[in-house]
């Protein structure tokens, strides 16, 4: 048995979904262990292009069991809509290949309202939320003000529980934000329209995972977002509200006894960021727009243009440390093929001194990038399938990054398709 976690090293959007899709042929189970519908994992295969927000990226592989663990922000509405979308494109979803933890907390209808209302209140001080209700959800979860998916099997008790929560939440909606209150009729419609649809998939996934582990099954843990969005280790407060690290996988998956053998950290060949907060290497103007256009850098969930810049060695090295990565997948190297000279941020200039250490979040706004330039390769590399197929300049770029971040780069993606990969 071998367990592997695939995690983001930077701000998210690194290409984790395509790596999970690639590697699932070697695994029996894929588990999402944190986060919700606020980010997207893009997968391109023979069935088409998919932007998965809640579903694990193993759903395209026959024989793979996909699990939404107890650490996930389970949004029944978004999940059911996503399930319908992928099933309409020929992907089979049954209670045999998709299982939802009965201990996963449900993202309730008012969580999205609270998210949008708070971002509006913050105005120019907003965090850049995707407005999917993630922060209000996790806040309520830790206040024990949500319901568990398993409560769907106890409908009478569930309605009483929801009524109590609604009374409490309506006070905030009406008194703080001046918004309309919820009614039980609204919640009953939500239960019938969405929760009843996903109910057949809800089960004791912890027991399933323990049995899988005992039987020597290979388990792949799929993270959302990246190190710099982690609640504890990220650029606080411009983080998500969950732990995005491999260390959280055993807890959020429902298999606390899991031993993670390999941690594959996914790094984009340049930097991108969605949302607010310090972004030391940010490009602006025409230079940024050209990179954004070549990489099609628009949020999978929001469609917002992503902030872009050169690869940030300082932030990436920190992300590798946070994740305890054992190998790296470098994605979208092909996007840089248009550049004559390729910029790399090797250090930060902070308080008049160069540093290669990632600073405390409050200091980041004062950091300036120290840029080094590498020769571009100026040719199409999308057909490369071996290391020797890559031009010398591309090899030099990859090996420089590898040396600087202190972790071997095992995979290099040169295109969006499943087989557009170089394995070293």
Predicted regions and their residues:
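Non-transmembrane, aqueous-exposed alpha-helical and coiled segments at domain scale
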Residues: 1-424
